[in-house]
């Protein structure tokens, strides 16, 4: 459960720039990014009564300071509860710790900083949900306080989780038992989270500026040896990636990605921009992130007027931005009993809180359109329809939420005088007498 908070403006007078205090403040701000982390602002509460839910925990600790998030979990024997409370500021966490040994109900609670208790887990099966991860820890008798999955809004391939457990010992035990565990052909990676020991990202070449994207290639130019010969003069090439499916669909504007061993080589290769390769003028630029192609395909489909293409796809909506294509595929196979061969592709449409599912043919898509509408997915009713249906639903939801926004004080003040004038109009009208009514109805 998340709670909003408002920062209190600083009312103190500004320090002189040359003063020692100002120098210390500058140093503190410079290091703020390093020191601002959940471990400083998050506390663990042990031995809460079984009746305590998120709301009760929030009410009990809200006087300590603004609260961002509260999680509650049962102990293994279910005889008491844990709570994880994330405050907006460090002083809120300090105030909460002063409540340790207080009696809540009939239980004496223990409050402490939640440090070195966060796990980083990755490479679990794509179909895994929070429940699967929670069950995984429960199987080794460890309580998961909270499980945080990444948003897939801009990158649908992200697959990791941050998991808070109740002690350092449990965190180390999880690493011992789960790191390297084989699950459905995937080797699980589990580590104690440490911001100072970040693993190298899979898209590091893109972020380091060592990867280029070559556009406007013909299908004949989609040859790794040809591309290597054309670009190896600029520096050592680490690898070349040619996205699949371009030759099969006879795209007129194909592309390829090339990773150099260093940034300077990639920048020199930009000289090839707008040069001729074969009989085509190619475009060369530093590569965008990997989701570039997928987002481009989504944009193309959203604007498409090709009726034959549109007849083979349906949209599912509304969906959370943490739902992956793998989870949707699993749902279609296990709950709707669709054969994986009948699904050509699943694309997330984060701009409209939905997904596009492309099927093998239009008849099958029409059948699925009727079957999937109103079905249950992750405890919620979802709709199915065309791209226009998804857009219309999203826009209606946006308009509906706008209607429920309370008018501001300024708007009320502006409308006030007009309302008063309208109320005075009836008072100015003269009341009709009996003679007036006789003339109106009897014509006298």
From Swiss-Prot:
Assigned GO CC terms: nucleus; ribonucleoprotein complex; spliceosomal complex; U6 snRNP
Biased composition (Basic and acidic residues): 1-16
Region (Disordered): 1-29
Subcellular location: Nucleus
UniProt GO molecular function: RNA binding; snRNA binding; U6 snRNA binding
Keywords recorded for this protein, A-Z: mRNA processing, mRNA splicing, Nucleus, Phosphoprotein, Repeat, RNA-binding
UniProt cross-references to InterPro entries, sorted A to Z: LSM_interact, Nucleotide-bd_a/b_plait_sf, Prp24_RRM1, Prp24_RRM2, Prp24_RRM3, RBD_domain_sf, RRM_dom, RRM_occluded
Modified residues (Phosphoserine): 19
Residue ranges annotated for the RRM domain, each copy included: 41-116, 117-195, 210-289
Top-rank lineage group of the source organism: Eukaryota
Record Pfam families: Lsm_interact, RRM_1, RRM_occluded
Record has Repeat as a keyword: yes
Gene3D superfamilies: 3.30.70.330
Record-level GO BP terms: mRNA splicing, via spliceosome; spliceosomal complex assembly; spliceosomal tri-snRNP complex assembly
Entry function: Functions as a recycling factor of the spliceosome, a machinery that forms on each precursor-messenger RNA (pre-mRNA) and catalyzes the removal of introns. Chaperones the re-annealing of U4 and U6 snRNAs (small nuclear RNAs) released from previous rounds of splicing, an initial step in reforming the U4/U6-U5 tri-snRNP (small nuclear ribonucleoprotein) that can reassemble into another spliceosome complex; this step involves binding U6 and facilitating the unwinding of the U6 internal stem loop, followed by base-pairing of U6 to U4.
Note: Present with 672 molecules/cell in log phase SD medium.
Subunit annotation: Monomer. Interacts with U6 snRNA SNR6 and the LSM2-8 complex (small nuclear RNA); to chaperone formation of the U4/U6-U5 tri-snRNP (small nuclear ribonucleoprotein) assembly, the protein is displaced from the U4/U6 snRNP once pairing is complete.
Protein name: U4/U6 snRNA-associated-splicing factor PRP24
Annotated source species: Saccharomyces cerevisiae (strain ATCC 204508 / S288c)
């Amino acid at each position: 459960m998340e709670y909003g908070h408002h920062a209190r403006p600083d009312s103190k007078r500004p320090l002189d720039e040359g003063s020692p205090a100002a120098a210390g403040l500058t140093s503190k701000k410079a290091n703020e990014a390093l020191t601002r982390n959940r471990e400083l602002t998050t506390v663990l509460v042990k031995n809460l009564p079984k009746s305590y839910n998120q709301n009760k925990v929030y009410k009990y600790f809200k006087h300590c300071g603004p609260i961002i998030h509260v999680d509650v979990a049962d102990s293994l024997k279910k005889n008491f509860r844990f709570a994880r409370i994330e405050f907006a500021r460090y002083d809120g966490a300090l105030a909460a710790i002063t409540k340790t040994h207080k009696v809540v109900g009939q239980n004496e609670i223990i409050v402490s900083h939640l440090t070195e208790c966060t796990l980083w887990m990755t490479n679990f099966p794509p179909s895994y949900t929070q429940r699967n991860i929670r069950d995984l820890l429960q199987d080794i008798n460890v309580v998961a306080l909270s499980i945080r999955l990444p948003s897939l809004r801009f990158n649908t391939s992200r697959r990791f989780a941050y998991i808070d457990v109740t002690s350092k010992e449990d965190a180390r035990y999880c690493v011992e038992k789960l790191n390297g565990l084989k699950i459905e052909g995937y080797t699980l990676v589990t580590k104690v989270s440490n911001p100072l020991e970040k693993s190298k990202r899979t898209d590091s070449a893109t972020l380091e500026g060592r990867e280029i994207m070559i556009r406007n290639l013909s299908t004949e130019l989609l040859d790794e040896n040809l591309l290597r010969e054309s670009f190896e003069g600029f520096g050592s090439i680490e690898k070349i990636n040619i996205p699949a499916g371009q030759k099969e669909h006879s795209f007129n504007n194909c592309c390829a990605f090339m990773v150099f061993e260093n940034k300077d080589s990639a920048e020199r290769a930009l000289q090839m921009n707008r040069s001729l390769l074969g009989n085509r003028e190619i475009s060369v630029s530093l590569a965008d992130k990997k989701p570039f192609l997928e987002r481009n395909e989504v944009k193309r489909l959203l604007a498409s007027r090709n009726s034959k293409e549109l007849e083979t796809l349906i949209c599912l909506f509304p969906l959370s931005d943490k739902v992956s294509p793998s989870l949707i595929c699993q749902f279609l196979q296990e709950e709707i009993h669709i054969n994986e061969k009948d699904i050509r592709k699943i694309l997330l449409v984060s701009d409209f809180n939905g997904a596009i599912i492309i099927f093998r043919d239009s008849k099958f898509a029409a059948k699925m359109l009727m079957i999937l509408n109103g079905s249950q997915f992750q405890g919620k009713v979802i709709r199915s329809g065309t791209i226009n249906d998804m857009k219309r639903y999203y826009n209606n939801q946006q308009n509906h939420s706008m209607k429920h926004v309370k008018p501001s004080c300024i708007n009320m003040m502006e409308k006030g005088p007009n309302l008063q004038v309208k109320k005075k109009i009836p008072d100015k009208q003269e009341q009709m007498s009996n003679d007036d009514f006789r003339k109106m109805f009897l014509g006298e």
